[in-house]
Amino acid sequence: MPPDLIATYTKDLNIELFGGKELLETFHFFTKEGGLFRADEYLVTGGDYQYYLDVYSVGCTTEDFYLEHGSDLLDSGINQQDLVNTLLELDMEDELTTKRIGRIAYKDFNFYELDGTTVTAKQIKSAVIDNDFRGAGLASNIYRMLTEKHDYIVCDNVQSIAGGSLWASSILTIAEVRIYDINKRKFVDVLGRRGRGINGFVPWSCQTLTADQILEWGRSYSHDTCHHIVNVISKDSLFDI
């Protein structure tokens, strides 16, 4: 709910989440910055959240081959799914160098659409990416993938500066981002540049940030708490690639 911004947070990717888990689906995607990735989606029972997504960098028996060959295929105009299928059909994964580099945790979140119907979205509660892969184009691919499957994705009510910046920049490049007021049960604006809605609504607050951290944020912010506000993207609002 954009949220109060906090300076940062850290989580250990090697810690297994509490609760029983069931594998729901496995996705693959490719980026020119990072190569081939796999994402395993789990349903969790008895844990803090209902779902989580483990993200892996897929190793190759020939170093950098996935990255180089995939980039060539991408430059040729091939679509993402055909590119991924081509790389997987080569059967060149090196399981010893495949490693977990990210984890996204999320839960069900209900809100009202413009026509008054109740919609169940997935609200992101934690998004952690290994430092070595934070420039690998993962976030936009993962959020697009989750939106295509679950129809609606909603941000958390507390975000790190990096998490808020993700929604205020990268997410804007993949979809229209609508601003929703939980108390009023309606959408109040559409997010534009610099952390401000196109009609002037500001969906972020900085209650606990220092002056230096507010400078690091570098965008508009509200002096009033924004715990009742969320940013929402939907499958229908995704931009064509």
Locations of regions flagged by a protein language model:
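Non-catalytic substrate-recognition and accessory regions of acyl/acetyltransferase enzymes
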Residues: M1-D130, R144-V154, G164-A168, L172-I241
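Glycine-rich acyl-CoA binding loop
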Residues: R134-L146
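Short, basic-rich loop-to-helix N-cap that marks the start of a DNA-contacting helix
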Residues: I161
